[in-house]
């Protein structure tokens, strides 16, 4: 949120905003498989707190660079190496984080745990953008100092976990690349996992839509940081509503229906937001987007984890993050589309691309349609 607004405000360039926000995705996509191997080989708890602490330091560093005006309109590129390193850290953190949840709660409670986790995290998604809008108004550096505090608090919470399970002990080959190859072959040969990963690639179209949000609020509607924060918070409200609903119905509805709901709600929200004539409709669209996102998060990650062997779980989750975090590459393409064609064309391309891949995969994958 903060970097997108800062870059757009300092440079006035949608393309530059998209480029800088796409950088973490490059690191995550290129390193996630190795993060998955580490999650399978070593204790996940240790990986989690160490990577989170490093991200805390980088957030603090970014805040200091903004405070002393070392980062400005002519040195905005300093954000590129920082974003690249943060992306590398998340590439190591994400597979371990997802796999660690299953270590603690087990497969039987994974759906409920995922719904509860999504509901808890979306409370922060509601509060953080609202607070972030105020912090951006007070000063760009405030946002990163606050992020550093939250990341450090998260580190302390991870360290305080008493009940933790070590990763399943598996035979370790001497060649990390062999482990990567075995993970790729395992995922490709499993029809359900393969279909879920193809579906996840639609995240790049979500990324194409992301630059539309600050441009719509700042340039189209002429609003400021606070309104930008509020509209992002409404995405969290929608996700919270969706998470609570999914927690209640739990396993009463087949996962394929939840997946269809996620596509329809999200892509309809994208269209409404892009063509909305006023701020109120933008808020409604963001709530709808949040509902779609919640349905996604309680469908695809859960199906992947519950249909993957224990010794391959970290690598499969890393593949999931490689595909879903193509949305950050979408930032770059979205920025280019915005500068060249505007908001309406951008959201149309994002919606058509997402629905086309999603519908085709569901139609031709029997294993996905029968998954539950």
How would you label these PLM feature ranges?
Residues 1, 23-37, 43-56, 78-136, ...:
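Substrate-agnostic recognition of the 12-TM MFS/MFS-like secondary transporter fold
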Residues 1-27, 185-233:
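Helix-loop boundary and gating motifs at the non-cytosolic
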Residues 4-10, 63-71, 127-146, 219-220, ...:
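Transmembrane alpha-helix termini and helix-breaking/packing motifs in multi-pass membrane transporters
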Residues 8, 61-70, 86, 158, ...:
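MFS-fold secondary transporters
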Residues 41, 47, 61, 181, ...:
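C-terminal transmembrane bundle of multi-pass solute transporters/carriers
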Residues 64-82, 274-285:
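Helix-loop junctions at membrane interfaces in 12-TM secondary transporters
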Residues 76-83, 87, 112-167, 233-237, ...:
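Hydrophobic alpha-helical transmembrane segments
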Residues 163-197:
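Juxtamembrane intracellular "pre-TM" segments in multi-pass secondary transporters
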